[in-house]
Amino acid sequence: MNNAPHLYFAWQQLVEKSQLMLRLATEEQWDELIASEMAYVNAVQEIAHLTEEVAPSTTMQEQLRPMLHLILDNESKVKQLLQIRMDELAKLVGQSSVQKSVLSAYGDQGGFVLAPQDNLF
């Protein structure tokens, strides 16, 4: 069975999904990026299945190589953008923890506002 056209089409679909994910990450549309991840994983699994059935010819491999490079480049860029986002979130969580500690330490003053007094003597 010659599945070369179907395999090539599957790779084209994967490239499109990869480009979509890069665009979403670049635009910081994190919810949409996460939602699109399953379609990407399914496309990768389909390619793996097609490749298991019949190994692509050398000619087909040469045709697919540029697509693979593009997909890998996109994936690397998405990972970099995700790491930047994770660092931002970690910073926000750290700030939130500090605020919680401050509120915990100084929030139990019984409703009294502690302020310096002018008349100490």
From Swiss-Prot:
Q: Which GO terms describe its biological process?
A: bacterial-type flagellum organization; negative regulation of bacterial-type flagellum assembly; protein folding
- Cellular component terms (Gene Ontology): cytosol
Is Cytoplasm one of the keywords?
yes
Residue segments, region Required for homodimerization? 1-50
Q: Where in the cell is it found?
A: Cytoplasm, Cytosol
Q: Where are the transmembrane segments?
A: none
Name the keywords, alphabetized.
Answer: Bacterial flagellum biogenesis, Chaperone, Cytoplasm, Repressor, Transcription, Transcription regulation
Q: What is its main location?
A: cytoplasm
Q: Which Pfam families match?
A: FliT (PF05400)
| InterPro entries the UniProt entry points to | FliT (IPR008622)
- Residue segments, region FliD binding: 60-98
UniProt function note: Dual-function protein that regulates the transcription of class 2 flagellar operons and that also acts as an export chaperone for the filament-capping protein FliD. As a transcriptional regulator, acts as an anti-FlhDC factor; it directly binds FlhC, thus inhibiting the binding of the FlhC/FlhD complex to class 2 promoters, resulting in decreased expression of class 2 flagellar operons. As a chaperone, effects FliD transition to the membrane by preventing its premature polymerization, and by directing it to the export apparatus.
Q: How does it assemble?
A: Homodimer. Interacts with FliD and FlhC.
By sequence similarity, the record places it as follows:
Belongs to the FliT family.
Under NCBIfam families, the record lists: PRK10548.1 (NF007836)
The name this protein carries in UniProt is Flagellar protein FliT
Say which species the protein is native to: Escherichia coli O1:K1 / APEC
